[in-house]
């Protein structure tokens, strides 16, 4: 589901001269049968320790992670709610979002439980969808009179921190310093953030691991920042993210990346981050 991996491969192909223009296309759908196959083989952990005992799918696993994060760092459901409500606010201006109505704190807090402490609005809505973009050299884009966004830096990490008994940090934390050094900017220069949002707790982890605050401080960070595009000092998931737009299977990882390109090339479909120069997508 990683849009960034495809971007890195395409950029390398262009840099090496193996291709002049690469079309990166992601499309997927969710059917009941295919979803059951997915949860049956979601990860090696799921294969060995979860699915055989009747707790299939990621909801249960991420519920454990969310519960641990809340107890370890003092995060509250109201903190996760603020993120979800802000993303829904952003989604109201995005024509392709599945969720068309505002989300209130009461509606979030009173939503039916899915896997404690996760409730309905902590989970993505499966859907069908697709995203696409072109990768080429800057001079080629100019010759074709195309608006473009420049890639300043990318990182890719798999199976990070395999010895952690509970994953409260991701691969971003291993490479974040080199990531910003290569880009020549820092977290303070980022105008908006698009994070992979399969669950709110993963957004919190990325806010921390990408250098916007220290580990365990994302809840306080969210409490003290406006995450909406309309009035926010820290716009996050400007299209609404997967929690409000929907998760088109493996194509979901390209949602934030394409939205980043739109924001930086004045090709917005929804809310506009005024004057944005630097965006970060995970």
How would you label these PLM feature ranges?
Residues 48, 81-82, 113-178, 227-239, ...:
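Condensing-enzyme catalytic core mediating Claisen C-C bond formation in acyl metabolism
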Residues 2, 6, 10, 14, ...:
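Stable alpha-helical structural segments in soluble proteins, enriched in small hydrophobic residues
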Residues 69-74, 176-189, 268:
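Phosphate/pyrophosphate-binding loops at sites that engage ATP/ADP/AMP, CoA/4′-phosphopantetheine
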Residues 33-38, 92-96, 163, 204-207, ...:
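Short acidic, glycine/serine/threonine-rich loops at helix termini
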Residues 1-25, 29-61, 99-125, 152-157, ...:
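Conserved catalytic cysteine-centered active-site region
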């Amino acid at each position: 589901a990683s849009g960034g991996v495809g971007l890195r491969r395409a950029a390398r192909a262009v840099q090496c001269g193996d291709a002049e223009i690469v079309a990166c296309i992601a499309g997927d759908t969710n059917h009941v049968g295919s979803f059951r196959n997915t949860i049956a083989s979601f990860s090696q952990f799921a294969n060995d320790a979860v699915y055989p005992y009747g707790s299939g799918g990621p909801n249960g696993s991420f519920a454990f992670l969310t519960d641990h994060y809340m107890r370890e760092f003092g995060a509250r459901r109201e903190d996760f709610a603020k993120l979800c409500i802000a993303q829904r606010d952003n989604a109201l201006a995005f024509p392709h979002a599945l969720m068309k109505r505002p989300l209130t704190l009461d509606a979030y807090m009173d939503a039916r439980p899915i896997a404690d402490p996760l409730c309905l609005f902590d989970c993505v809505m499966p859907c069908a969808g697709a995203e696409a973009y072109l990768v080429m050299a800057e001079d080629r884009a100019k010759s074709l009179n195309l608006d473009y966004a420049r890639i300043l830096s990318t990182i890719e990490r798999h199976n990070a921190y395999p010895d952690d008994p509970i994953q409260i940090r991701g691969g971003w934390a291993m490479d974040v310093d080199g990531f910003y050094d290569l880009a020549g900017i820092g977290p303070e220069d980022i105008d908006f953030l698009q994070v992979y949002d399969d669950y709110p707790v993963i957004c919190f982890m990325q806010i921390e691991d990408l250098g916007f605050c220290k580990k365990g401080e994302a809840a306080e960070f969210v409490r003290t920042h406006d995450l909406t595009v309309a009035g926010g000092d820290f716009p996050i998931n400007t299209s609404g993210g997967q929690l409000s737009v929907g998760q088109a299977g493996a194509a979901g990882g390209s949602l934030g990346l394409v939205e980043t390109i739109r924001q930086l090339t004045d090709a917005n479909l929804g809310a506009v981050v005024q004057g944005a120069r630097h965006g970060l997508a995970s």
